[in-house]
């Protein structure tokens, strides 16, 4: 019997680093914003582009430019090419870029049998089908002294001959948040797209700032608590792709008209009659639909049970330091906020309004408070969230502009935030058609996905039409 054909053929695996001599060896400490991500899974994303050319054209015309522009981009975003260093306890982990040694693993692959249109479709598909276009982050190296060195990022570009290209990314979240990642991708994209043009005529995004870490002071041993949990959970365990069984992922889009109708309904039902934002009302609607899906098989009948949703607020330019943290700061700079709603409210007749009011109140509370003073209590809220039934969180945000990634091929025809499959996350982005709608990614068991889809359509009919 002939050997089964593998769906992807690895053409090349190479290492991309900043241009020689452009970046000195650099060590960056982890801040209390970084430490919570030490124990969490990788952040994975995929960008699909239409591309009608052959593999030969792809290798000759597109890949060399992509690699060259990535090298230049890493000159400014060099931590992505570095390592997460984990010394033996009690020394804290840190980021390090070793000039002339460190690099980012870059894989070039070709699809031999996978259907590009099916892979990028919105319809439910087994979560494992996307893993073939995700890069494999190399395993950590451990020195004789017990110092663990973990690669931070890997990239993969895969061609589907005559159909399209997928650019995939895997990275440890401890190095930076979605704001920084979006900044990195847009800088790389701008360089790639401008290849061959006069550099003086190319408008590039602002450069990232690395020097602010020394002013981000821990307001109350916040990082120490996360380090203790990291060490107790076995710091030698390396994050990797773990595929849950019987899971599918699907994408749903709420149009601008549907969102405006949702806003009107919530405003009319709310006691204070205050307008709500697109983000809040969309999140409220999706959270309600998701919880209604999940509780159908729940054994608990307690009406006073409380469900929790974790949101994140960008702290750039919001912290009361003597020097503000700029929008281009490279790193994590997000504050977690827990939204809590009782079961009978979240499943009741005015469920979307209840969720919307709770989310709005939590955001207002966070934006009006001194975030540094509340930071020592963030861990308590997160632990409450973790221990609850069906804890839900968010990945991505429409404001990140993840569909603005034009590498000279036009904007993506699809974008996926893959790591939502690890459980309980809702992926958010702007709609790809530019109509100011919102795109939502969900991962569930197949049976539950059918229920979610049905509830979502019923909700749209009730609240948004």
Swiss-Prot record:
UniProt EC number = 2.3.1.-
Modified residues annotated as N-acetylmethionine in this record: 1
Q: Which UniProt keywords apply?
A: Acetylation, Acyltransferase, Transferase
One example of the protein's molecular function in GO is: acyltransferase activity, transferring groups other than amino-acyl groups
The catalytic residues are 173, 406
Q: Which cysteines are joined by disulfide bonds?
A: none
Q: In which tissues is it expressed?
A: Highly expressed in flowers, and leaves. Lower levels of expression in stems, roots and siliques.
This protein's record includes keyword RNA-binding: no
InterPro entries, from UniProt?
CAT-like_dom_sf, Plant_metabolite_acyltrans
Q: Which Pfam families does the annotation name?
A: Transferase
Superkingdom in the source lineage: Eukaryota
Q: What happens when the gene is disrupted?
A: No visible phenotype, probably due to the redundancy with 3AT1.
Any idea what job this protein has? Involved in the acylation of the 6'' position of the 3-O-glucose residue of anthocyanin. Also able to use flavonol 3-glucosides as the acyl acceptor.
Protein family membership: Belongs to the plant acyltransferase family.
What is the protein named?
A: Coumaroyl-CoA:anthocyanidin 3-O-glucoside-6''-O-coumaroyltransferase 2
Originating species: Arabidopsis thaliana (Mouse-ear cress)
């Amino acid at each position: 019997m002939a050997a089964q054909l593998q769906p992807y053929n690895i053409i090349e695996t190479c290492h991309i680093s900043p241009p020689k001599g452009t970046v000195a060896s650099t060590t960056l400490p982890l801040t209390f914003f970084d430490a919570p991500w030490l124990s969490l899974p990788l952040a994975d994303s995929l960008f699909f582009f239409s591309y009608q050319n052959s593999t030969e054209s792809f290798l000759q015309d597109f890949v060399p430019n992509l690699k060259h522009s990535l090298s230049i981009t890493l000159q400014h975003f060099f931590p992505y090419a570095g390592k997460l260093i984990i010394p033996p306890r009690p020394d804290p982990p840190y980021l390090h870029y070793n000039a002339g040694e460190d690099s980012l693993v870059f894989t070039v692959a070709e699809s031999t049998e996978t259907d590009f249109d099916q892979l990028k479709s919105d319809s439910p598909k087994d979560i494992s089908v996307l893993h073939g276009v995700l890069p494999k982050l190399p395993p950590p190296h451990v020195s004789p002294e017990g110092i663990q060195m973990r690669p931070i990022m890997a990239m993969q570009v895969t061609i589907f001959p005559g159909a399209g290209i997928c650019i995939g990314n895997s990275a440890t979240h401890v190095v930076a948040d979605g704001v920084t990642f979006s900044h990195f991708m847009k800088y790389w994209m701008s360089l790639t797209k401008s290849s061959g043009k006069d550099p003086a005529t190319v408008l590039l995004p602002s450069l990232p700032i690395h020097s602010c870490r020394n002013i981000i002071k821990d307001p109350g041993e916040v990082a120490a608590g996360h380090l203790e949990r990291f060490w107790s959970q076995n710091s030698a365990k390396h994050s990797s792709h773990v595929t849950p069984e019987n899971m599918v992922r699907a994408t749903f889009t709420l149009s601008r008209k549907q969102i405006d109708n949702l806003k009107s309904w919530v405003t009319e039902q709310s006691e204070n009659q205050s307008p709500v934002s697109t983000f809040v009302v969309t999140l409220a609607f999706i959270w309600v639909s998701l919880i209604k899906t999940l509780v159908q098989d729940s054994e608990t009948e307690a009406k006073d049970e409380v469900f929790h949703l974790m949101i994140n607020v960008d702290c750039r330019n919001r912290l009361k330091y003597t020097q503000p943290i700029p929008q281009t700061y490279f790193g994590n700079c997000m504050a977690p906020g827990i939204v809590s709603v009782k079961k009978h409210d979240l499943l009741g007749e005015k469920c979307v309004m209840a969720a919307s009011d709770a989310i709005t109140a939590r955001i207002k509370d966070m934006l009006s408070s001194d975030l540094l003073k509340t930071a020592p209590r963030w861990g308590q809220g997160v632990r409450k969230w973790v221990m609850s039934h069906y804890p839900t969180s968010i990945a991505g945000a429409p404001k990140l502009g993840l569909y603005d990634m034009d590498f000279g091929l036009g904007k993506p025809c699809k974008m996926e935030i893959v790591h939502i499959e690890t459980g309980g996350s809702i992926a958010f982005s702007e709609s790809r058609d530019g109509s100011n709608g919102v795109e939502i990614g969900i991962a569930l068991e197949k049976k539950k996905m059918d229920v979610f889809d049905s509830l979502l359509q019923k909700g749209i009919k009730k609240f948004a039409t």
